[in-house]
Amino acid sequence: REKLLVVISPNLTNPYYVMLLQGIESRAKEQGFGLFVCNTQRDLRMEERYLKMMWELKPLGIIYTCNPSHCFMGLVEELSREIPVAIINNQNEKLNVDAVELDNSKLGRMMAKHLLELGHRKVAYIAPPLTTRQKQRSKRVEGFLKEFAEAGIKDQVIIKAAREELDLDVAHIDSEYKIGYELTRELLEETKDITAIVGLNDMIAFGILDALYEAKIKVPGDISVMGCDNTLFARMHKVELTTIEHFVIFKGRDACDIIMKKISSHNNKYSDMEPISTYHVEYEPKLIVRGTTSYAGENSKKRRSKK
């Protein structure tokens, strides 16, 4: 039969997940495997439907590009006893399946350190819903706050996270961009003294940039902006985005390698194969400084005095 791998993704409009898919597909192709991609759109019913299809579809492996929803953790573990399963960004120790983890806390700290070195003290962090279902998001924010706490100015960070319902809003495929755009507009109404705004990922940062542009606020002269993921579009915006490169494509390849190792390790039951383990990504994250961050300077002071 066809050598088939299944990839379950929550979103294919965010370039981050497309890059993961590209990494998985390139490695799978090298090994003669085809892919079946399931886009859940963060819809619990769709996720459940896809998971229940797996017993009939019988793929040789399953890769989740984010954590499964909490209500399906047991179902995923049950599946993993028959089919190799790997999860990217799993930071839930209770889920007994193979995982490729990334130190999201470290990414947050790197973002904070860059802004602190540029003299930014009053900053905002814009994020999607910070739910237990998306633990990696919270880890990134926690890392950012920890760096500011060590500098003694944690109380100078404004966290603006979207409502939880937005994760379930399937109708708007550009929801992460809208989070950045709409929460930045709210932020500008609420406070006048921030010198930098961080987006949890590049898509949110693009929304931030457009909201600032509409408000005639100069980037980075008035407000610095930073994202994370180093997606292709980070180099294509009006002002190229400062971001963090954490080698997303390679994470996809790593997850595929885990599955291949499980498949090749034994031809008998999955329980006889390699033991469950967590694979930490070995690629060191890298700060990519482009055109959207600069020193906190006089432009910001002039903007505040005008208001």
PLM regions: where:
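Alpha-helical recognition/docking segments in bacterial nutrient-uptake
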Residues: K3-K113, E117, E189-D193
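Short beta-strand elements in bilobed, periplasmic/extracellular small-molecule ligand-binding domains
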Residues: A28-N39, L145-Y177
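An alpha-beta-alpha
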Residues: M111-I153, M273-T292
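Short acidic capping loops at alpha-helix termini that bridge into adjacent secondary structure
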Residues: K122, D155-I158, V219-V225
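Short hydrophobic segments within beta-strands
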Residues: I8, C38, I88, Y125-I126, ...
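Flexible loop/turn connectors
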Residues: R185-K306
